[in-house]
Amino acid sequence: MTFSLAIVGRPNVGKSTLFNRLVGKKLALVDDRPGVTRDRREGDARLGDLSFRIVDTAGLEEADAASLEGRMRAQTEAAIGHADAILFMIDARIGLTPTDRAFADLVRKCGKPVILLANKSEGRGGEAGTLEAFALGLGTPLPFSAEHGEGLSDLYDAICDALPEQTRPEPEEDEDADTDFVEEEADDKPRRPIKVTVLGRPNAGKSTLINRLLGEDRLLTGPEAGITRDSISVEVTYAGAKLEVFDTAGLRKRARIEDKLEKLSAADALRAMKFAEVVVLLVDATHPFEEQDLRIADLVAREGRALVIGYNKSDLVARGGLITRLREDVDRLLPQVKGVPIVPVSGLMGHGLDKLVAAISSAHKVWNKRVATNPLNRFLQQVTDNHPPPAVSGRRIKLRYMTQPKARPPSFVLFCSRTDAVPESYIRYLVNGLRETFDLPGVPIRLTLREKGNPYAD
């Protein structure tokens, strides 16, 4: 039986370090300064034979509800409300603070099992703080070190004691029982969610858009630019489509990024792009389509991901011919993803979300598309009849055979003579022909030239 644990505590006590250790990956950003984590992040964790959901949360701070810190606290309280048990963490080196005491009262009132972790307790410096934690009235504190992995066996025992029903081993099934009544497995496997990463400049409205798709304020939003730091994934079902959507930090020009934490956030956003199948580039309609938007789109194309452009905050501008001009600019400046869908949306008002999800589903299908060999070679014959490759130094280039070895993105191999002599302009001509003939808008197309391995070689 699965269960969920929320890691809570004041800022900089080591919550994200523990989260990363339990999920076995460096998913959450970690830095020495307090307040790095803002949104709550979920992951699949393992500890011994236990499998469970773990939630990393923002550090608890006393703050006005309308402030950024107050909104972060509301996200943490929501995580406490959804969890089966709480891992309350303190910094044993520093000892108890008034903030620890205040939020221990909050956790105690939630009525859920609480496991008290005295983190950073390795060495003599942590002993006094561990003993001091008894005063919180949350039970016996566990000496722990998230950084070095000390105390994990004690944590395992504490989880089993706190959640005996959820952690009890499942009874083994008798393989011979009821064999005559076992139904065959269905051929159709459950459909996987489409992995979607939302990228854009700071304050483009990425988190607001995802919250609207979810139908709840799951991600931290506000007027401040640069609120999102970690890349947070959430599962969305909208208009019948299943999506796993990654929210990311806003991407500024590299030359403007000086802060170490912003560099980490940008790297995390680009890593999320590499996990994606479809990338939604969210453009702020109240600002012109800038060079940074083009850079992001070019990165997506070079990474081989399907692209959809969301024209956000479109309710705030008089659209008129804006979309037409944007389409012309994108096709001219980004020929490698010609025909990319451009969808006017409003994350705040909820306008256009059905069209955005439909565009994501369509782009995913195109990205996965395969073309049979016979149609490919009929295409090759037709384009070479209409426009044969130019002769180089008096010698004709022979285009012999084309095949598609892989999709995601559509990738083609052309067997020909003198691959080094084929002009780039002719390769672009072939790629554009493939895109138009086989209906491949908005995805990068890979075309590789080879001289050997042609099964129809002379």
UniProtKB/Swiss-Prot annotation:
Identification of the protein by name: GTPase Der
NCBIfam families found in the cross-reference section: GTPase_EngA, small_GTP
Using the record's annotation, list all stretches that form the EngA-type G domain: 3-167, 194-368
**What are the boundaries of the region Disordered?**
167-189
Q: Does the keyword Nucleotide-binding apply?
A: yes
Identify the coding gene: der
* PANTHER family documented for this protein: GTPASE DER (PTHR43834:SF6)
- Residues binding GTP 1, per UniProt: 9-16, 56-60, 119-122
Listed under GO biological process in this entry are:
ribosome biogenesis
Gene3D superfamilies to which the protein is assigned, alphabetical:
3.30.300.20, P-loop containing nucleotide triphosphate hydrolases (3.40.50.300)
Pfam assignment, any one: MMR_HSR1
* GO terms, molecular function: GTP binding
Q: Which residues form the KH-like domain?
A: 369-453
- Residue ranges annotated as compositionally biased, kind Acidic residues, are 171-187
Q: Which InterPro entries match?
A: G_ENGA, GTP-bd, GTPase_Der, KH_dom-like, KH_dom-like_a/b, P-loop_NTPase, Small_GTP-bd
Give the binding site residues for GTP 2. 200-207, 247-251, 312-315
For this UniProt record, the keywords arranged alphabetically read as follows: GTP-binding, Nucleotide-binding, Repeat, Ribosome biogenesis
Disulphide-bonded residues: none
Give the quaternary structure.
Associates with the 50S ribosomal subunit.
What job does the chain carry out? GTPase that plays an essential role in the late steps of ribosome biogenesis.
The Swiss-Prot or TrEMBL record describes its family as follows:
Belongs to the TRAFAC class TrmE-Era-EngA-EngB-Septin-like GTPase superfamily. EngA (Der) GTPase family.
Naturally occurring in which organism (per UniProt) = Xanthobacter autotrophicus (strain ATCC BAA-1158 / Py2)
